[in-house]
């Protein structure tokens, strides 16, 4: 309902956006947990392949055990929001790849999909997190996924300026 109030045509037609009230059709999709995905891929690359601090088997064991017994690895990687060019570029690549994938098909109402990084009033990141196991970026089983392009809580260790530099790199 809140979205319908903000969209031109819905009030005039007394219809929600889900029932054809919008004057202009657009379809969008949001990547809930995008930063969790990017940070997780960054950690796998950093610890398993580049620095060889752990094996993939050990990392999988840490995830199965919700990080218990593996605290030395948890939350010590390269994460989005710290002005880390590698991780920031990984986010850009994921955005481009996911956008290209979504646009292989047209929305039912025509046009093309608009990509969004889920910024809003919706709490999907919480409910999806409740159903998601531990992730390689240090997130525990059941914790909320990241909402939008914010850094995982506690991972933006270099302050606001570094977070803004990371966000400014995004396309």
Regions found by a protein language model. Give the residues of each.
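Acidic, glycine-enriched catalytic cores built around paired aspartates
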Residues: 1-171
């Amino acid at each position: 309902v809140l979205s319908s109030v903000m969209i031109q045509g819905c009030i005039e037609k007394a219809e929600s956006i889900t029932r054809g009230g919008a004057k202009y059709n657009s379809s969008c999709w949001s990547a809930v947990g995008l930063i969790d995905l990017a940070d997780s891929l960054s950690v796998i690359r950093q610890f398993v392949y580049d620095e060889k601090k752990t094996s993939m088997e050990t990392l999988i064991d840490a995830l199965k055990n919700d990080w218990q017994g593996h605290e030395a690895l948890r939350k010590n990687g390269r994460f989005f929001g710290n002005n880390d060019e590698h991780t920031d570029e990984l986010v850009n690549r994921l955005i481009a790849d996911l956008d290209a994938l979504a646009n292989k098909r047209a929305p039912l109402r025509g046009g093309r999909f608009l990509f969004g990084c889920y910024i809003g009033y919706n709490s999907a990141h919480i409910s999806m997190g409740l159903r998601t196991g531990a992730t390689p970026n240090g997130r525990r089983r059941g914790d909320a996924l990241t909402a939008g392009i914010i850094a995982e809580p506690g991972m933006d260790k270099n302050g606001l300026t570094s977070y803004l530099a990371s966000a400014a790199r995004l396309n």
